[in-house]
Amino acid sequence: DEVIGGKKVKRKHEPGAVEKATMWGPAVAIARSTVEEKLGKVPLSPYLALDLIAAAKSGSKEAAFRREDDAIEELIASDQFRASIYAFNLVQKHAKKPSGAPDKALARKVSKVGVLGAGLMASQFALLFLRRLEVPVVITDVSQERIDKGIEYITSELDKLVEKGRLSQDNRNRYVGNLSGSLDYAAFADCDWVIEAVFEELKIKQEVFAKIEEVVSEECILATNTSSLSVDAMAKSLKHPGRLVGFHFFNPVAVMPLVEVVRAEKSSDEAVATAMEVATNLRKTAVITSDSAGFVVNRLLGYLLGEAMRAVDEGASFEEVASAIAPLGLPMNPFDLLELVGLKVGAHVLDSMHAFNKERFYASENLHKLAEHGKLLERDAKGKIKSYDKKAMEIVAGGKNARSAAEIFESVQVGLAKEVKLMLEEKVVQTPQDIDLCMIMGAAWPFHLGGITPYLDRSGASEKAFGGSFHEPMIIGVRD
C-alpha cells in the first residue's frame, strides 16, 4: 500500500552504492541467462523487463517511468501482444464452444469407469477418473501382478497428495474404496465408460474391445487412447461400432489439458457427446477431430520431429538443428522432446506418419538405432541436460549433405504450413482455431506466438506454402 501510495519504503536488504556498482550488472546478466535457458530468445516481454531493471541502476525516477512507458508502448504495438490476446480468447472462449460438438443432452451418464490396462498411462487414467468423476473405477491387465502394481501406483499417488496437504485422508480412503482390479472382464459388466490403454498395436486393441463388448451393455461407450492407430479400423471388430470414440490424452495425464476426441466414421452422436462431457468433467479441453493419422498434435509434431531427424541424417549436428529450429519458440527442442516421450515411441510415431504419407513424412533409421542405444542426452547428477550423448552422435554421424540453418528452418516452416492447410481441407478439424487450440494445449505452443496458424502467417510461411494466409486480416501488431 505504501508503494502504491508513493511513499518510500525502507527495505531490509536494499543494496547500497557499492552493491549497485559491482553487483547490479552481474545479477541482471544471471537473470537474463536464466530466462534464455527456460524461455529461449523469442519472448519479448521478459527481456524488456530485464532491460528496465538494468537501466534502473542509475538516473531519475522520472526517466525510469518514461522508459517503462516506452516499453509498454512497444509491447502493446507488438505482434506478440496481439497473438497473446488471440491465444487467450482461444483458451477462454473458443474452447468452451467446441466446433462440431453434438447436443450435450445426448451424453450418457457415467456412473462407473473401466480401464483396460494397468501400466503407467492406464494407471494415470484411473487416478484421474477417481478424483475428477468420483465414481467406481475397475482396471484389468494380462496378469494379477500387473493389476496389483497398477493399484499400488494409484494408491501411492493418492498418499503423496495427502502428504502434501492436497487431499484429505477421508477422500483418499473413499477413492481407494472406489478402486478395484480384476482379471475377469465380468467386473466391467456395469461400466458406462470403458477406455483402453493397452499396447499400441491394432490387433491387440481389436481383441480387447471385442472381448469387453461381450460383457458390457449396449449403452456402454468404448474409448481408445490411441495416438496413431485408426479408430475406424478398431471399430471393425465391434458388433456396435457406433459406441467407439477416440479419447487421446497427452502425457503427463494430470498436467496436460488437452484431449483429442476422435469421431470415427461410425461414431454415434451419443458416443461423441459422452466423450465431450467426460472431458469436461475431467477438467480437460476437448477438441473434436476426424479419424486421420496422428489427429492434430502428433501429425504436426511428427512432421517437425521427422524434419529434425532428416536434417541430422543429412549431416547437421543435433546442436545445429536445435539452434535452427529455436525461433519457433517451442518449450523444448525436437531432441529433448524425443527423449522425453521415449526414443522408441518417437520412432514409432515417425514410422506411423511415414506409412500414412511417404512423401511428406520422414522416417529415420538412425532414430531406431538411437532407440536401441537408449540414450540421446547427457545429464549431470541432478538430471540437468549437459550435452548430447557421445555414442548418439557417433550413431548419426556420416551425413554428407548438411543444409544451412536458414534452409532447415524455412523447410520446417513451409512444410508445417502445407500440412495445416491439408488438415483443414481434409476436415480433420473445422477451423484454424481448432488447430491452434490443440497446439497450445497439447504441445505447449507458446501463448505469445498465438498458436501455429497466426505464426505461420506472420512468418510468411503460409504465403510460400499456398499463396495465402490462414487468417484475414492477419493477427499482427501495429505497423508503421
Set out the residue ranges of the language-model regions:
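N-terminal glycine-rich phosphate-binding loop for ADP-containing cofactors
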Residues: 1-480
